[in-house]
Each structure stands twice: as structure tokens, then as C-alpha cells.
């Protein structure tokens, strides 16, 4: 007997138990899913197929479980297993470097706007993609092509306007697709192609008006389809015919027109009673509200007018918008198309696309339209044709491509076009024709290559064209060398060239007709052999005209070029294009055709942008210089192809934003200079800070230009939390092809109508020709939003809230022909508001509030034919007489405009009323005058003067003693509100005040907050309670977080990583530590190690700290890394000069008389005195700068005068004291004085004058006992009295100028003696204390001050005269005694020796055997007689930039060089003048250089 089976003795296997347990649950879930699916939301509610348990979607893993490690998880996301959750993170772009193993990706609840082609590359295992609740309006082609495993895709609750064709073609496994709650209007026939497994498709809550009849073709597995709440009026016949498994269909809430075209739907719904309930008619009126399924066929009627009309989305509707289709011809001429249409009627045989803006023919552009016989693409902007763009067109007979920008014909582009008879390629930029280009064109009879850049043609190019009858080759720069000999022979035998093709070069052949030349004329010299490979498009070019070529370097610097030359030699390694007028780098493949190019310089041009893929193929470029241009943004396709780029310089452009991924592919980049760019540090730039920290590149640092809170802060140092977007600062990079939100862009027409816009959108495309902004809420026309629209011809701003047209608002819109501003609140038209509109033909200002028109307002409107001014309350006095005369000249006003005032002119037509009736009989009312000038409303108070400003703004110029927008406040002790915490300040008497505290505060200044930690608190885990304003917060112990410190912190996670400057965070469970990079230290590696503590700078050089390094900033005349280079005086003067042992302390020795023994000292900035021994003027440039002096003597009086200059609103000028004190500071641009001799309360006063304007001001301070007097710029003196028992201010502490040390500053601030802790920033030119000029060199202590005001004065000079190169000049005469041997006559190699007793002042020392006065006689020398050459030493004027290290002068300098010869002596400067030159460095540092300018040259023996 067999042993019993092991399975009969054991309980059922676990897998079987599990199935028995969950089977009832699954059946229940299936029942619920079937009924709830169309309206369910999340991935968890997908339909369960009828294929049984195997398709339920529950997976019990039986092997290893994949996990995405932390290193492969995007920093802003969280990863669990193979799931990546990036939801609700405020993202503006899809995170980079998502693991290729991810199966579920959640991106819902972010701020994504565009899905780019590269966003989901390599994610071949992705099964679920969640993109709901974003702002997505565009999906690029092929964005989902790598998602071959995708099962569920949610795109609902976005702003999609259209769905790309074939966008899920690669996703054959897709089960569920949700695109509901968007703004989609049409669904084309190829949208869902390839999604044969799709079971659930949700398209509800869109704006769909058109469904292609084949839209759902092939979706044989579809079970659920929702189309409810759209704008469908009809449906193509039998559109649901192939959906045999459909079990849920929603069509409700659509405005169906129940005519004869919809009768099929009624029959369909009656046969499938469970589908599409509540589908009702909207029209005609007798059927409105009726259920479609309840109607009989005879009730669906069509009127005679519509019986034969095509259905709204019928088969005929495949005609592409906005083209016209008839009889097999698709006419798309002049429709502003930018690409070839993707849909055409099936019977199309002729396609007309001329005069559009098409730029390329992509692969297989016409492969679906095999019936095409004629294609016209003339007069477009086509520069690129894919090699298979014309594949499949076997019936094509005519191809017209003239008037484009084609530069290259790819190999095989005409392959298979055996029926082609006419090929027009004239008026392009074709430079070469491959030998096999026309190989398949056996039927071609006419070929035009007229007007291109072809230099040669390879033998055999025309061999395959057996039917050719006419060829046009003229207007090409043919090089008639031996390589073109065959063409002359060919044209002799086949006289088919009828355009008169001629030679361009060589010179002997210039302008000679090719067909008339004999074969022996076609010769090749060595350099002309470069055309030998023309048939392979590998010929090389000569050096471009206007450029200089040396070796492999092509230098086109400073040639005034407006575009890059096309004939750059192929062997070029360095291309220099600096200092030209290039405006934009085109994506025309130029750099990709230079295989050896390593260095490209484009500095100091007018570049505003670089087209995407402009550098594609330029894989060997290592250095790219783009500094000092006008580039405004960096796109993510700008530098594609630069795989070996190491150095990228974008210094001094106008870059405000960088698109994510812009530098991602620059793997070799080591140096990136982004200094001097106005980066907008909002939420769109947060990724860039992280990228910069990670890369640690060399070069100028990128700094924020906005918002003001973070201005000048290095981007990489800014924490992620500081990158914020607000309503005023939310704009990111717009990029090419951008269309503003709430607008639709079709070609060059932009429509932004009826969108409740408050202002004109930013980023309107520059090529816009028509702009519609009507029916919004725009109140003001921002000039900067429209000034770039130079192609605009029509602008509609009607039905808005505009109140004023300011001067020169439309000055740049020179092509504008129609301007509509009707039905606004326009009350003021300024004199030059319409200046520049020379081509304006129609102007509508109808329905506004205009009363007056300035004379000459319409003088630029030379082309005007119609003006509408009706329904305006025009005031018809003598001020409008000019308008009456003007409209009667050409009758451009149709007789609608009427007068509203004055009474005698009321309701009279301006056109028909005689001009003599327009007279002035009294003063115009203020309410009318105030429409353009708000000052007539008298807004200013206290006798202030009102000054009118643009946009009907105004400014009140206050009388002394008042301030505020309307001068409504007095300048008294309460100026600037000295009370804290929103307390109310009340003046007690002159100079004294009291504070009434808000609830929760106490103290003299309401500075003390009531301690809320004394009551019951909820802080946990030994947290410390921190008092707030009627609240408290818990300060947690290390390792805890949360409002009440009840959460354990996960150290070193993306949410908590305080380590800065590239430091590595290490988690120790209870705490963390940071492993700092070199050059940093501190708990979070935030402190830069001061490398200047042990610096080696010599000769007074200033140490400048860096990152793990320092630099020495040398004084004048010293050079070297450590300023170790010697002073130049010893070389500038002979050893006998008095300057050799001068006594100048802080200056340069100067001899006014070269022959004398006296000298003067020219002092360095800030120093005075005979020997420059006194430091009397200093600059303060740091927040903690100050000077410490001895205590101020106050008996019998204290008198302090400070001459200073500052552009900062706040800063400490002087301070001395403790409780009793004298404090003087800048506060809100005025001088604030706090004076207390010990009599409480303190006395305070403010200057009436504003002094923070960058100009020099003198403030005089006089303290006599209790009295204190202030006078500014010798104006009116004002006084206060600190009344009380004490008479004198007793001071024993040091006096500080320009700032305070930390401890005294905190104490003074705490005691309300000063209003801010900021040091003075500016220059103190002179300081007098008790009638003595202060020598700061004797100060007890100095901290971070700079001698003199040179920097400030340099900036002032720059503002006053930007064109002036030099700041001053000082004659310098080099001491050079006359050399008697300078023009000696010694011969035959003899030596000249000075001798004062000789007749000529010198003596000739002859060689052996020579004699004579000049050694010109005798024997003994085998040397031939020599003659001293006449001196050719001369001064040569030049004008160029002066450069030094990485710096240069601001302007080209006019100076001279000594050139020529002096025999055996040197040609050098005899007289020089020293001038100060402003220098600017690449890192934005500025300084002043003392430069010796040559004034006279001569010969000298001293060659140095």
C-alpha cells in the first residue's frame, strides 16, 4: 500500500489559504469598482478587468525586493522601496536623476507647467505616474516615449489645452488615463494611438468641442469613457462602434444639438441602456432638456440650410487650422505656421505652405500623405531638413524650396523621388552639393540652384538626371579651378544652363561664363586643391573677409560684424569674435561644422540670446567666452553639445534666471563665471543654489540682484527657504516659444481676452503681430511690457480700467496700424503719448473720460484715417480749437465726438462746429485740470510744494520741519517713532516724548514683553519655553522638534541638513556633526577660516581673505603675489636724485625741476602735510568699521565739525558717553542727535535736511552746558535744551567715529541712545574737534577703515562724466642729462667716451691700428666702415584698453608708445605724465591705477 501523500497530512498551503481568504473581498471590490469607476479618483480605484483573479493587481513578492537607495533618491523627494514621492513640494520642474528602477512616481500638488521631452527619460520600469493638481499647460512631443511599462497616468486638474499626437504610443500596457478637469478643446485621431490595453479613459470637465471620428479607434479593451461636462454639440457617426467592452459611458452636461446628424446616438443609447444616462439635448428649443435616448428618429431633423453641411468634427474636418482645403489642394499660404501640418485630408495632392515661418522639416514630415504630387515651401525660414523628411513621396512631381535658409542637403534627402520633375532650391544658403544628391531623380527636367553659396560641384553630380532640360547655376561664387573643369565640358555637350553661371575666382577667371571657357583655363594651384572633396562637402574655406588668420586661429575681433561669417575654415581651433555687433547666435549648425574648434570668444557684442542646439555637434569646444553681452536668461538647451567644455564665461550680462538642467550635461565644466548678473532669486532658482554648492566651480560668483532682501548675496550661500515666489516676483525663465498664461498664441497672434488680467502679461513673444487684451481689468500700460513688440500691427485694449496714457508709451511700436483703447476710464492723454506711431491708421478712444487734449498730441499720426472720440466729456474751449482745425483737414473723425462743456458748447459736434466757437471765457475747473495733474487736487499740506510726476503721480516738497507723503507730519521728538512694538508716541515738550504701550508690553519705550512662560505650558522633553507676544514657543533639546518638541529629529535627512558649504552631514542619533570642506569651520561649516591671520603681504599690502586662500592687494608701485616687487622710484630716477632718500611718509616723491635738488611729496589719498604725515580723511566700508579717539572735552564747550559723504540712509557718525552721552547718527537719511547731560529724559532732535545723497555735507555740533546746537551745510541752526540739575556733559569714555565696538554698541542701543547698530558707510573728508583737524593716524584704535575718499570720489567722477578716461594728470619729467655721445661720429667700431674738454664733448677710442679724430683712418680693422643710422625713435599714438592681470580700463585710452631705433641705444620715454585711470575687473572689483602716459620720446642709453 502506498504511503499517504505528504500534502494530505499537512494543512492547505499558505498561498491557497490566502486566496480563500481574500476571494470574497475581491469580488466585493470588483462589484463596487464597476459602479464607482468613472468618478473615482486615485490610483487605488482602477477598474478590475474581467479576466479573473490574475488581473486584480495584487502582487505577493516572491523574490528580492527592489529598493531605491538614499543616494539615488532626489533630494527634495522621499523614497520607499521602488516608490518616489515628490508630491506637494512646490516643484517647478521634474527632479533630475530619478532612479531608472522607479515603479511609482508621485508629482501631484506641485507647480509644474511644462513636461519636457527629457523629464522621464530611461524610466522604462515606471508603472504609475501621478501628475494631478499642477499647472501643466504643455507636454512636449515624445515626453512619455520611454515609459514602456506605464499602466496608470493621471493628468487631471491641470491647464492642458491640447494633447500631443501619439503621446502614449510607447505605453502599450497603459490601463488607466485620466485627463479630466483641463481646458482641452479637441481630440485628434492619433492621440491615443498605441494604447491598445487602455481600459479607463477620463476626459470629463474639459472644453472639448471636436472629437475626431477615429479618436477611439483601436481601444478595443476600453471599459470606461467619460466625456461629460464638455462643449460637444455633435458626435461623429458611430464613434463608439469599436468599443465592444464599454460598460460605463458619460456624456451628460454637453450642449448637444439634436439634429439629423445625432439620430444615430439615440439608436445607440437605446441599444445599450446602461450607457450614458442623462444625455440631453440643448437645441433646438423644442427638444431642449429631452433625453437623447427617449427621442425617435423622426424627431432629429435638419433644416434645408444644414442638411448637407459637414458635421462639426466629421471626416472633412481633417483640414488643418487655419488652412483652406478644396479639390485635393490644401492652401496654407501666409498663415503664420511654424511647422508642417500633421493632419491633411486623405485626398490631398497639392500642399501650399509658402510665406510662413517654418524652420525645419523633421523626419518623415510627409510620410502619411503618399498621394502628394506638389509641395510648395518657398519663402519660409527652413534651415534644416532631416535626411528622411521626404521619404515615401513616390508620386511627388514638384518640390519648391526657394527663399529659405537651407545650408546643407543631407545625404539621401531626395532618395526615392523618382517621379520628381521640378526642383527649385534657389535663394538659399547652400554651400555644397554631395555627388550623389540627385542620384534617384531620373525624371527631373528643371533644377534651380540659383543664388546660393556653392563654390564647386563634383564630377558626376548631374549624371543620374537623364531627363534634365534646364539647370540654373548663376549667382554662386564658383571657384573655377581644375575641380570644375568637368562642368564646362558638360555644359558644352549639354547646353542646359540658361541663367549664365560665371566664375567668382581666381581673379583671372572673374565674371567669365563657365560654359564659354576652354578646358585648359581650369587650373589648380596648391591652395586651390581644397575644393577637391567638394562632392563630399568636405572642402575648406579661405580666411573670411575682414578677419585675420594665423595658423589655426581666426581673429575677427572689432570688425563691426552683425553676423558670424559663414566661411570659417574647417581647420580652425580658435575663433575670436569679440567687440562686434552680433545680436543672436542661431541654431544653424555652424559650430557643428568646425570639428577642431576648441576656443570660442564672443565677448562685448550685443548678444541677447542663443537659440536651442546652437552648439550641437561642437563637441570639442573647451572654452566659451560670452562676457559683457545682453543675455537675459539661460535655457536648458542653450549649451547642448558642449560635452568637453571646461571654461564658460557669462560675466556682466543681464541674466536673471536659469532653467533647470541648463548645465547638467556639461560634465567637464571646471570654471563658470556668472558675476555681475541681476539674478532674480525666487522659487524658480532654488535648484541652482543646490547645484552650485554641489559643483564648487571656479570663476566669478553668481549673486542675487532681486529681491532687495537678498541683493548681493551669493546664490550658493542662500538657504533653500529664502528662494520664494510672490505675486510680484514669480516669473521664471520664459524660453523660446513661450506663451503667457491665460493667453493663447497662434502663429504671431496673441489673445489674452476676458481673463480678468490686472496688468499686461510679461513675456509676450517679440514677434507678435496682433495682441488682444480686451475685456480685462488692466489699469496701467507698462511700457516695459510692450516696448519689445516692434512687429506689432494691432493692439486691442478696449473694456479695461486704464486711466492715463503717459508720454512715449507706444514709441517703439512703429509698425502699429490699429490701436483700440475704447471703453476704459481714460481721463488723461499726455502730449507725447502717441509719439512714434507713424503708421497708425485707426485710433479708437471712444467711451472714456477725456476732457482735454494737449495741442500736438496727434502730430506723429501721419497715416491716420480714422479716429473715434465719441462718448467723452470734451471741454470745448480755446484749448481744443487746434483739434477742431485738425480733424477738418482730412475728416478723420466721423462726426460723433461732441462737446460736454462749457454750457454754451454742450452737445455740439466738433466736426461741424466752426473753430471760431472754441473760445476761453473763464478759468477751467480744478476737477478737469486734475485729470492729468493731481496737484490741482491740492494733496500737499502745511504749505508744501506739489510737483507733478508721470502716471498722474505727484511729490510733495515739504517745508522745513515737516515730512510724510503729504507733509502731514512734523519733525519732532517722535520722528521715526522711537517707541517700540507699535506703541503710540506723544510729544511732551521740545525734544521730549512719552510712549503709550500696546497690550502686552511695558517699559519706557514699551520695550518689555510680558512673560507668557510663567503660566501653564506644553513644552515636552525638557524643552525651554521662549516668551513671545501673548504667546510662547518651545526651544527643543538637541534631537527633538515640533511645536512642543514632541518629535524626534531625523538628522542629516533632506528636511534637516544644516551643514553648509558642501560639508558632509553625519548622524550620531542624539546629535549630528559636519565634516567641513577645506577653508571652513564651525558647527555647521558656515565660518570661513580667516587665512589672513598669518599672511605674508609685504610693503603695506592689504590681505583679502578667500576660501582656503588669500590675496595681497598691493599699494601703488608694488607688484607680486606678496607685493614683494620693489618701488619703482629707484629705477625712475638716477642714483643722484634727491628722491632716492626722500622723507615722504605716505606719498610719492616728485621733482618739479629736473635739474634742481628740491622735491615735493605727492600724498596718497587721505594724507596731508609736507611729508604726507597726517591721515585726515578716511572711508568706512564695513558694517563694523570705527575709529577710537580720546574722550571729548566738553568744558567750556564741545565743538565738532564733520565733513562727510554717504549714500546710505543709516549709520553712526559719532558717539561718546555711557548713561550721559552725545550720539550723532544718520537715521532715514537725516541727522539724528541724542543729547543727555544726565537730566532725564533724554533730548532728541533731527535735521530738516536730507544728507544721504552721496554729496559732501558739513555738520556742525556745538554743546555748551545743557544746550546743544545743530547746523547742516551752514544753514539754519537749531537747538535743544536737556533741562535738569546737571550743567555739563561729563565724558570719560573713548569717543568713537563712524561706528562702535560690539559691547558699547549693544549697550547704547539697549538704552535707546542710537536707533541702529550699523557703522557709517561713506567718507569723512575732514573732522575738526574743538577747532583742531583730527589726525586719524594718531587714533587709539582703527578698525576696517581705508585712507582717503578715492573710491567715493572715483564713483562721483564716473557719474559726472562717463566719457572721461583720466581723472587727473601730473607732469613727470625724467631726469635725463644730455648725452654727448647721443649723435657721435665715431667710425669703424670705435667707442665714444664723454669728455667735457673735447670740442664735441666726447672722444672716440680707436681700435688697434686706427687713427683720426673719428677713427676713420689707418689700418688694423677688418670691419667694413660703419655709419651710425639716423635715429628713427618716434612717438606713436594708440587708442586701446589698458589691461592688467584680469582687469582693464573702463574706456579705451588715448596714449602713446615709443617705437623705432636709436642705433645701439634705446628709444624710450623722455617726458611722461601720471594719470589716474579707473579699472574694472572680471570679478566686478574696481580700483584706480596710476599710469604713466608718454608725452615725449627720445634716444637714451638707459634701457629700462
UniProtKB/Swiss-Prot annotation:
Disulphide linkage map: 543-549, 547-556, 657-733, 681-704, 683-725, 935-946, 940-956, 958-967, 974-985, 979-995, 997-1006, 1013-1025, 1019-1034, 1036-1045, 1052-1065, 1059-1074, 1076-1085, 1092-1103, 1097-1112, 1114-1123, 1139-1149, 1144-1161, 1163-1172, 1323-1349, 1381-1392, 1386-1404, 1406-1415, 1433-1467, 1447-1481, 1458-1497, 1462-1499
Glycosylation positions in this chain: 111, 231, 381, 459, 807, 812, 982, 1022, 1084, 1183, 1199, 1267, 1316
GO CC entries: axon; cell surface; extracellular region; plasma membrane; Slit-Robo signaling complex
Species, as recorded: Drosophila melanogaster (Fruit fly)
Expression across tissues: In embryos, highest expression occurs around the midline glia and low expression is observed around CNS axons lateral to the midline. Expression can be seen on the commissural axons traversing the glial cells but it is absent from the cell bodies of these neurons.
Keyword Nucleotide-binding appears in the UniProt entry: no
Alphabetic keyword roster: Developmental protein, Differentiation, Disulfide bond, EGF-like domain, Glycoprotein, Leucine-rich repeat, Neurogenesis, Repeat, Secreted, Signal
Superkingdom of this protein's organism: Eukaryota
CDD domains: EGF_CA, LamG
Purpose of the protein: A short-range repellent, controlling axon crossing of the midline and a long-range chemorepellent, controlling mesoderm migration and patterning away from the midline. May interact with extracellular matrix molecules. Repulsive ligand for the guidance receptor roundabout (robo) and prevents inappropriate midline crossing by Robo-expressing axons.
LRRCT domain ranges (all copies): 254-304, 476-526, 677-727, 872-922
Signal peptide extent: 1-36
Domain Laminin G-like: 1176-1349
Subcellular location: Secreted
LRR repeats: 101-122, 125-146, 149-170, 173-194, 197-218, 221-242, 347-368, 371-392, 395-416, 419-440, 443-464, 571-592, 596-617, 620-641, 644-665, 767-788, 791-812, 815-836, 839-860
UniProt cross-references to Pfam families, sorted A to Z: EGF, hEGF, Laminin_G_1, LRR_1, LRR_8, LRRCT, LRRNT
Name used for this protein in its record: Protein slit
Site (Cleavage): 1135-1136
GO biological process, one term: outflow tract morphogenesis
Subcellular location, principal: secreted
Subunit and partners: Interacts with robo.
Gene Ontology MF, one: calcium ion binding
Domain CTCK intervals: 1433-1504
InterPro entries for this protein: ConA-like_dom_sf, Cys-rich_flank_reg_C, Cys_knot_C, EGF-like_Ca-bd_dom, EGF-like_CS, EGF-like_dom, EGF-type_Asp/Asn_hydroxyl_site, EGF_Ca-bd_CS
Domain LRRNT, chain residue ranges per copy: 64-100, 310-346, 534-570, 730-766
Residue span(s) of domain EGF-like: 931-968, 970-1007, 1009-1046, 1048-1086, 1088-1124, 1135-1173, 1377-1416
Amino acid at each position: 500500500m502506498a504511503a499517504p501523500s505528504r500534502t494530505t497530512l499537512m494543512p492547505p498551503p499558505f498561498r491557497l489559504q490566502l486566496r480563500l481568504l481574500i476571494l470574497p473581498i475581491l469580488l466585493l471590490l470588483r462589484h463596487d469598482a464597476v459602479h464607482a469607476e468613472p468618478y473615482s479618483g486615485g490610483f487605488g480605484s482602477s477598474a478590475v478587468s474581467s479576466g479573473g483573479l490574475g488581473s486584480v493587481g495584487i502582487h505577493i513578492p516572491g523574490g528580492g525586493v527592489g529598493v531605491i537607495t538614499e543616494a539615488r533618491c532626489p533630494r527634495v523627494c522621499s523614497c520607499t522601496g521602488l516608490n518616489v514621492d515628490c508630491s506637494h513640494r512646490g516643484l517647478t520642474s521634474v527632479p533630475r536623476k530619478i532612479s531608472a528602477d522607479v515603479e511609482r512616481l508621485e508629482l501631484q500638488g506641485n507647480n509644474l507647467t511644462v513636461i519636457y521631452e527629457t523629464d522621464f527619460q530611461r524610466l522604462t520600469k515606471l508603472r504609475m505616474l501621478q501628475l494631478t493638481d499642477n499647472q501643466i499647460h504643455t507636454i512636449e512631443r515624445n515626453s512619455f516615449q520611454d515609459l514602456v511599462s506605464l499602466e496608470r497616468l493621471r493628468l487631471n486638474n491641470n491647464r492642458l489645452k491640447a494633447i500631443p499626437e501619439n503621446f502614449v504610443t510607447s505605453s502599450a500596457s497603459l490601463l488607466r488615463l485620466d485627463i479630466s478637469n483641463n481646458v482641452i478643446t479637441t481630440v485628434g485621431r492619433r492621440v491615443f494611438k498605441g494604447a491598445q490595453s487602455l481600459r479607463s479613459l477620463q476626459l470629463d470637465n474639459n472644453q472639448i468641442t471636436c472629437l475626431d471620428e477615429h479618436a477611439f479607434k483601436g481601444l478595443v479593451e476600453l471599459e470606461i469613457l467619460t466625456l461629460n461636462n464638455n462643449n460637444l454639440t455633435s458626435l461623429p457617426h458611430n464613434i463608439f462602434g469599436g468599443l465592444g467592452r464599454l460598460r460605463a459611458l458619460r456624456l451628460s452636461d454637453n450642449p448637444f444639438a439634436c439634429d439629423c446628424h445625432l439620430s444615430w446616438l439615440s439608436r445607440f443609447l437605446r441599444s445599450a441602456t446602461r450607457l450614458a444616462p442623462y444625455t440631453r439635448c440643448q437645441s433646438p428649443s423644442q427638444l431642449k432638456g429631452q433625453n437623447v435616448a427617449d427621442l425617435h428618429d423622426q424627431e432629429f431633423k435638419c433644416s434645408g440650410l444644414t442638411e448637407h453641411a459637414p458635421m462639426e468634427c466629421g471626416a472633412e474636418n481633417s483640414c488643418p487650422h487655419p488652412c483652406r482645403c478644396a479639390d485635393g489642394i490644401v492652401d496654407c499660404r501666409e498663415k503664420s505656421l511654424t511647422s508642417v501640418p500633421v493632419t491633411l485630408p486623405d485626398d490631398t495632392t497639392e500642399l501650399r505652405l509658402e510665406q510662413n515661418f517654418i524652420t525645419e522639416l523633421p523626419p518623415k514630415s510627409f510620410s502619411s500623405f503618399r498621394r502628394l504630387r506638389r509641395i510648395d515651401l518657398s519663402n519660409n525660414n527652413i534651415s534644416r531638413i532631416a535626411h528622411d523628411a521626404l521619404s515615401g513621396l513616390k508620386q511627388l512631381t514638384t518640390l519648391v524650396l526657394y527663399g529659405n535658409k537651407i545650408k546643407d542637403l543631407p545625404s539621401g534627402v531626395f532618395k526615392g523621388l523618382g517621379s520628381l520633375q521640378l526642383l527649385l532650391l534657389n535663394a538659399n544658403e547652400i554651400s555644397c552639393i554631395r555627388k550623389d544628391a540627385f542620384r534617384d531623380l531620373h525624371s527631373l527636367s528643371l533644377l534651380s540652384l540659383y543664388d546660393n553659396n556653392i563654390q564647386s560641384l563634383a564630377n558626376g553630380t548631374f549624371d543620374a538626371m537623364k531627363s534634365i532640360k534646364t539647370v540654373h547655376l548663376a549667382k554662386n561664387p564658383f571657384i573655377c579651378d581644375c575641380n570644375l573643369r568637368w562642368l564646362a565640358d558638360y555644359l558644352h555637350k549639354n547646353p542646359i544652363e540658361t541663367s549664365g553661371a560665371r566664375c567668382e575666382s581666381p581673379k583671372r577667371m572673374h565674371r567669365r561664363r563657365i560654359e564659354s571657357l576652354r578646358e585648359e583655363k581650369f587650373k589648380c594651384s596648391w591652395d586651390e586643391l581644397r575644393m577637391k572633396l567638394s562632392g563630399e562637402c568636405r572642402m575648406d574655406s579661405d580666411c573670411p573677409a575682414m578677419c585675420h588668420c594665423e595658423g589655426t586661429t581666426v581673429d575677427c575681433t572689432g570688425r563691426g560684424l552683425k553676423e558670424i561669417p559663414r566661411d570659417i575654415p574647417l581647420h580652425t581651433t580658435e575663433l575670436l569674435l569679440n567687440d562686434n555687433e552680433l545680436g543672436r547666435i542661431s541654431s544653424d549648425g555652424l559650430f557643428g561644422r568646425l570639428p577642431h574648434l576648441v576656443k570660442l570668444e564672443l565677448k562685448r557684442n550685443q548678444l541677447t540670446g542663443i537659440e536651442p542646439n546652437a552648439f550641437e555637434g561642437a563637441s570639442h569646444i573647451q572654452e566659451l567666452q560670452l562676457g559683457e553681452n545682453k543675455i537675459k536668461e539661460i535655457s536648458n538647451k542653450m549649451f547642448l553639445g558642449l560635452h568637453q567644455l571646461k571654461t564658460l564665461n557669462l560675466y556682466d550680462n543681464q541674466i536673471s534666471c536659469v532653467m533647470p538642467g541648463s548645465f547638467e550635461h556639461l560634465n567637464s565644466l571646471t570654471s563658470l563665471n556668472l558675476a555681475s548678473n541681476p539674478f532674480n532669486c525666487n522659487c524658480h532658482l532654488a535648484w541652482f543654489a543646490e547645484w552650485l554648492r554641489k559643483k564648487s566651480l571656479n570663476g566669478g560668483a553668481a549673486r542675487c540682484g532681486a529681491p532687495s532682501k537678498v541683493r548681493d548675496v551669493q546664490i550658493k550661500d542662500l538657504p533653500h527657504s529664502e528662494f520664494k515666489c510672490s505675486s510680484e516676483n514669480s516669473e521664471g525663465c520664459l524660453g523660446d516659444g513661450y506663451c503667457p498664461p491665460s493667453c493663447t498664441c497662434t502663429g504671431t497672434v496673441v489673445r489674452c481676452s476676458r481673463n480678468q488680467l490686472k496688468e499686461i502679461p510679461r513675456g509676450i513673444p517679440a514677434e507678435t503681430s496682433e495682441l488682444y487684451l480686451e475685456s480685462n481689468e488692466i489699469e496701467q500700460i507698462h511700457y516695459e511690457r510692450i516696448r519689445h513688440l516692434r512687429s506689432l500691427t494691432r493692439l486691442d485694449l478696449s473694456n479695461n480700467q486704464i486711466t492715463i496714457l503717459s508720454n512715449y508709451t507706444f514709441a517703439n511700436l512703429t509698425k502699429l496700424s490699429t490701436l483700440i483703447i475704447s471703453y476704459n476710464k481714460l481721463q488723461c492723454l499726455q502730449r507725447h503719448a502717441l509719439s512714434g506711431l507713424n503708421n497708425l491708421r485707426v485710433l479708437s478712444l471712444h467711451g472714456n473720460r477725456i476732457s482735454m487734449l494737449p495741442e500736438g498730441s496727434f502730430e506723429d499720426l501721419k497715416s491716420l484715417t480714422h479716429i473715434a472720440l465719441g462718448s467723452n466729456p470734451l471741454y470745448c474751449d480755446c484749448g481744443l480749437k487746434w483739434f477742431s482745425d485738425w480733424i477738418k483737414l482730412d475728416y478723420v473723425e466721423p462726426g460723433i465726438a461732441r462737446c460736454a462743456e462749457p454750457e454754451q458748447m454742450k452737445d455740439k459736434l466738433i466736426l461741424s462746429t466752426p473753430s471760431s466757437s472754441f473760445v476761453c471765457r473763464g478759468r477751467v475747473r480744478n476737477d478737469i485740470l486734475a485729470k492729468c495733474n493731481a496737484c490741482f487736487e491740492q494733496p500737499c499740506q502745511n504749505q508744501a510744494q506739489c510737483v507733478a510726476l508721470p502716471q498722474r503721480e505727484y511729490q510733495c516738497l515739504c517745508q522745513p520741519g515737516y515730512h510724510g507723503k503729504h507733509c502731514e507730519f512734523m519733525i519732532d521728538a517722535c520722528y521715526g517713532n522711537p517707541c517700540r512694538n507699535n506703541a503710540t508716541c506723544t510729544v511732551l515738550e521740545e525734544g521730549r516724548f512719552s510712549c503709550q504701550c500696546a497690550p502686552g508690553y511695558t517699559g519706557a519705550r514699551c520695550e518689555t514683553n510680558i512673560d507668557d512662560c510663567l503660566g501653564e505650558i506644553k513644552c515636552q522633553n525638557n524643552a525651554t519655553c521662549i516668551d513671545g507676544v501673548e504667546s510662547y514657543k518651545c526651544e527643543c533639546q538637541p534631537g527633538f522638534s515640533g511645536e512642543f518638541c514632541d518629535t524626534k529629529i531625523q538628522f542629516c535627512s533632506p528636511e534637516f541638513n544644516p551643514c553648509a558649504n558642501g560639508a558632509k552631514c553625519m548622524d550620531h542619533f542624539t546629535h549630528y556633526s559636519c565634516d567641513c570642506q577645506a577653508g571652513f569651520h564651525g558647527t555647521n561649516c558656515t565660518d570661513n577660516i580667516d587665512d589672513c591671520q598669518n599672511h605674508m603681504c609685504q610693503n603695506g599690502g592689504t590681505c583679502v581673505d578667500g576660501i582656503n586662500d588669500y590675496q595681497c592687494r598691493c599699494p601703488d608701485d608694488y607688484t607680486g603675489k606678496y607685493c614683494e616687487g620693489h618701488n619703482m622710484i629707484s629705477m625712475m630716477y638716477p642714483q643722484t636724485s634727491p628722491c632716492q632718500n626722500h622723507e615722504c611718509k605716505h606719498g610719492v616723491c616728485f621733482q618739479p625741476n629736473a635739474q634742481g635738488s628740491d622735491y615735493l611729496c605727492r600724498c596718497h589719498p587721505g594724507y596731508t602735510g609736507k611729508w604726507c604725515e597726517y591721515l585726515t580723511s578716511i572711508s568706512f566700508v564695513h558694517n563694523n568699521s570705527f575709529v577710537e579717539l580720546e574722550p571729548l572735552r566738553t568744558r567750556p564747550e564741545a565743538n565738532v565739525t564733520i565733513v562727510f559723504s554717504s549714500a546710505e540712509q543709516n549709520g553712526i557718525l559719532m558717539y561718546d558717553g555711557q548713561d550721559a552721552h552725545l550720539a550723532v547718527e544718520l537715521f532715514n537719511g537725516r541727522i539724528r542727535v541724542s543729547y543727555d547731560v544726565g537730566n532725564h529724559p533724554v533730548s532728541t532732535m533731527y535735521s530738516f535736511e536730507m544728507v544721504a545723497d552721496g554729496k559732501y555735507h558739513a555738520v556742525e555740533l556745538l554743546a555748551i552746558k545743557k544746550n546743544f546746537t545743530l547746523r547742516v551745510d551752514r544753514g539754519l541752526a537749531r537747538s535743544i535744551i536737556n533741562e535738569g540739575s546737571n550743567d555739563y556733559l561729563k565724558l570719560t569714555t573713548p569717543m568713537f567715529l563712524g561706528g562702535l565696538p560690539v559691547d558699547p554698541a549693544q549697550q547704547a542701543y539697549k538704552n535707546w541712545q542710537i536707533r541702529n547698530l550699523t557703522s557709517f558707510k561713506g567718507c569723512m573728508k575732514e573732522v575738526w574737534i574743538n577747532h583742531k583737524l583730527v589726525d586719524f593716524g594718531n587714533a587709539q584704535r582703527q578698525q576696517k577703515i581705508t585712507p582717503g575718499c578715492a573710491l567715493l570720489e572715483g564713483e562721483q567722477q564716473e557719474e559726472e562724466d562717463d566719457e572721461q578716461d583720466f581723472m587727473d594728470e601730473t607732469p613727470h619729467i625724467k631726469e635725463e642729462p644730455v648725452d654727448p655721445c647721443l649723435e657721435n661720429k665715431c667710425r669703424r667700431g670705435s667707442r665714444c667716451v664723454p669728455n667735457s674738454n673735447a670740442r664735441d664733448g666726447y672722444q672716440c677710442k680707436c681700435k688697434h691700428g686706427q687713427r683720426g679724430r673719428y677713427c676713420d683712418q689707418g689700418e688694423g680693422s677688418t670691419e667694413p666702415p660703419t655709419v651710425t643710422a639716423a635715429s628713427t625713435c618716434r612717438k606713436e599714438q594708440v587708442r586701446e584698453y589698458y589691461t592688467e592681470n584680469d582687469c582693464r580700463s573702463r574706456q579705451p585710452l588715448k596714449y602713446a608708445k615709443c617705437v623705432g631705433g636709436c642705433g645701439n641705444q634705446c628709444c624710450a620715454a623722455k617726458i611722461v605724465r601720471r594719470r589716474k585711470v579707473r579699472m574694472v575687473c572680471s570679478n566686478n572689483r574696481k580700483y584706480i591705477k596710476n599710469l604713466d602716459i608718454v608725452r615725449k620720446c627720445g634716444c637714451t642709453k638707459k634701457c629700462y
